[in-house]
Curated annotation (Swiss-Prot):
It is a peripheral membrane protein. It comes from Parvibaculum lavamentivorans (strain DS-1 / DSM 13023 / NCIMB 13966). It comes from the Bacteria. One of its GO terms (molecular function) is proton-transporting ATP synthase activity, rotational mechanism. This is ATP synthase gamma chain. The keyword Cytoplasm does not apply. Produces ATP from ADP in the presence of a proton gradient across the membrane. The gamma chain is believed to be important in regulating ATPase activity and the flow of protons through the CF(0) complex. One of its GO terms (cellular component) is plasma membrane. SUPFAM superfamilies: ATP synthase (F1-ATPase), gamma subunit (SSF52943). It is found in: Cell inner membrane.
Amino acid sequence: MASLKDLRNRIASVKATQKITKAMQMVAAAKLRRAQEAAEAARPYAERMDRVLANLATGMTGRSDAPALLAGTGSDQVHLVIVATADRGLCGGFNSSIVRLARQHINKLVGEGKTVKILTVGRKGRDALKRDHASRIVKSYEFTGIRHIGFEQAEDISRTVIDLFEAGEFDVATIFYSKFVNVVSQIPTAQQLIPASVPADAGGSVDLGGAVYEYEPDEGEILKDILPRNLSVQIFRALLENVAGEFGAKMSAMDNATRNAGDMIKKLNITYNRSRQAMITKELIEIISGAEAL
């Protein structure tokens, strides 16, 4: 049985840890509100961009001059897998769930004989995938020194992806991230970026009122300008969803840790009090026994 001194030290240690987890929970809660607002504000713009692309893409059906970012290369042999995670841990299974989904996709492609290249965004994803896919990682991004993720970071990633695509390095690009739902729910999500994935009902959801639109210049020229911007927008939305999800998961994880620390302190206090009571009882028995012997 642990001594009273050991128990006091353990109680003090757990209380110190509880203070840290409580502080981290409060910090995550403060950051979550801003991150959630940013993620929710980005969704309508990205969805509207999908609808614009759907309308423009309709006019490109069957045309041989469709932009490569929309039409693709005509092959799906080489895949670029973009894995977006957090740079830091202590957020429950947030990072591991994204990596797990990406790893399943990678293993499936490899099993089909496809070539896979990986671009990681976030230190946790890079570290996890380096263990069994180090040779496939072509580029890694970290934003540990950046206080708030901005559109310029998404544009930087987008430029890298487009440069790799134009250099013939891959045929299909898919990004893996976590879609924020609420504090306790983040959904690991996969979204195809190249060729641009246009929802089948996006174009039909726009009421054209029977009007016929003429584009100047034509759809192809407009798409050449819009598609790179759309790629940046979709990556930016994924990053914002990730940030909100990370803080939500961290807030939940630290809340659980704080509660668990409280439960442990109660159990240790009970053990301490019982040990102390047993020690006092033993000393009393010894005193009484000594007195009777006299």
